[in-house]
């Protein structure tokens, strides 16, 4: 809900809209509960610290702000990222019921948390061992497409992330992917990337801007700002 309200207000700002509806959304946004950390360091799922009846439950709705949302980031809220990590580790360490579409969510969450090897391991053991020839997945005896849809997103998140002010290159590269090449990866801000790496290190990057403007790149902690022109690489 918070992300929806924020995106709505940002869109209204860009479009120059300021009316009763925007005022109402702003007021409602202030009433939303803020992310809270429990005494054990995990991100709280509820407004109270309630005992879980199923510690390994597959749903991770309270971690939405980390993935696919971007309210929780390492740059701005590192303490909440730590809480998300503890929450996910807790689920995975308590006989996590990995099945169905939640597999895609957790796989992508691990990629965003820069747990590349864990993310790839979940892809290989929980997807590719259960996949049907048509790429549907065996979800408790029934074919399901939703969980496999999470695989491309997780793969991209391992190689490129653009949910913050920066575009991070190879942020979560798995050890097994020491050499590789990708073309046509789209990043927020209307940028298209081609990249190649050897021995886990980036050796070339080509960036095409579809609308021009500033591009903030980050690789291994170093930031480079580029001024781009529409339609040019």
Tell me what each language-model feature is.
Residues 2-166, 203:
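Active-site core of glycosidic bond-cleaving carbohydrate-active enzymes
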Residues 117-232:
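Non-catalytic C-terminal accessory modules of carbohydrate-active enzymes
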């Amino acid at each position: 809900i918070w992300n929806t309200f924020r995106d709505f207000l940002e869109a209204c700002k860009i479009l120059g809209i300021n009316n009763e509806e925007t005022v109402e959304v702003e007021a409602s946004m202030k009433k939303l509960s803020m992310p809270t950390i429990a005494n054990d360091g995990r991100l709280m799922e509820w407004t109270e610290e309630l005992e879980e009846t199923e510690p390994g439950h597959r749903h991770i709705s309270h971690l939405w702000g980390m993935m696919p949302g971007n309210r929780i980031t390492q740059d701005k809220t590192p303490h909440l990222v730590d809480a998300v990590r503890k929450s996910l580790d807790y689920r995975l360490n308590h006989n996590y019921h990995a099945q169905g579409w939640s597999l895609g969510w957790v796989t992508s969450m691990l990629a965003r948390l820069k747990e590349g090897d864990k993310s790839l391991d979940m892809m290989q053991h929980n997807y590719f061992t259960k996949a049907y020839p048509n790429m549907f997945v065996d979800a408790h005896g029934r074919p399901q497409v939703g969980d496999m849809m999470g695989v491309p997103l997780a793969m991209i998140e391992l190689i490129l992330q653009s949910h913050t002010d920066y575009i991070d290159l190879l942020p979560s590269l798995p050890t097994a992917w020491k050499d590789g090449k990708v073309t046509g990866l789209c990043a927020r801000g209307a940028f298209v990337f081609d990249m190649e790496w050897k021995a886990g290190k980036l050796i070339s990057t080509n960036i095409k801007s579809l609308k021009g403007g500033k591009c903030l790149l980050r690789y291994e902690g170093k930031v480079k700002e580029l001024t781009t022109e529409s339609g040019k690489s």
